[in-house]
C-alpha cells in the first residue's frame, strides 16, 4: 500500500520518520509477523547502513538506523534508492543476475547488480553516475563540482531548461510530455539534448 507523507523544508527528519513509523505500526498488529523490518531509501551515498553524503538536502550526522532500531526494536536498513530499485526489479520482475538500472529524477542514479549481488564500489560511490562531469566549467552542482551530468539530463534540469526556453515560470513533467507528444519544437529539442547527454 502506497501512502504519501509530505516533508517540508526544514522539517526534522528523525521526528518525521518516528511519526510515520508510529502511524504505520498499528496497521500490522494483526499480522502474524507484524513488521519484520524497515528500509529507508535515500538520494545519496550509503555505506554499511550509514549515510555518508546527500547532495540535495542535508541529513543529520547521527546514525539514523541505530536510533530508529533502538526505539522501535525492529531492524532498520538505510540504502541508496537506485540500489533498492535494482534489487526490486531483480526480485519482483526480471529475476536477472546482472543488470543496471537508471533512476532519473532531481538527480541521476544507477543501481548495479553483478552475479546477483549489489555492486557498490569503493565507499559506495559506484552508482553515482549523475556526478560524471560532462562540462568541466559547466553549471555548479550541489556535490561541489561543475558540469555534472544531472545538471543537464535529470528530470529537474530538463524541466527547468524547458521552462526557460518557453518563457514559463515552471513546467510539470506531465505538461512537458504532452508538449513532446504534440511535437512542440522546444520539447523535441530538449529530448534530443537529453538523449545526447544520457548516451555519452
Please identify what each model-predicted range represents.
Residues 97-152:
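Glycine-rich phosphate-binding loop of actin/hexokinase-like ATP-binding domains
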Residues 2-26, 30-98:
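Glycine-rich phosphate-binding loop and adjoining helix at the ATP-binding site
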Residues 9-31, 149-152, 157-200:
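Adenine-nucleotide phosphate-binding core of ATP-dependent small-molecule kinases
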Residues 5, 52-56, 146, 178-179, ...:
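Conserved short-loop catalytic and cofactor-binding motifs
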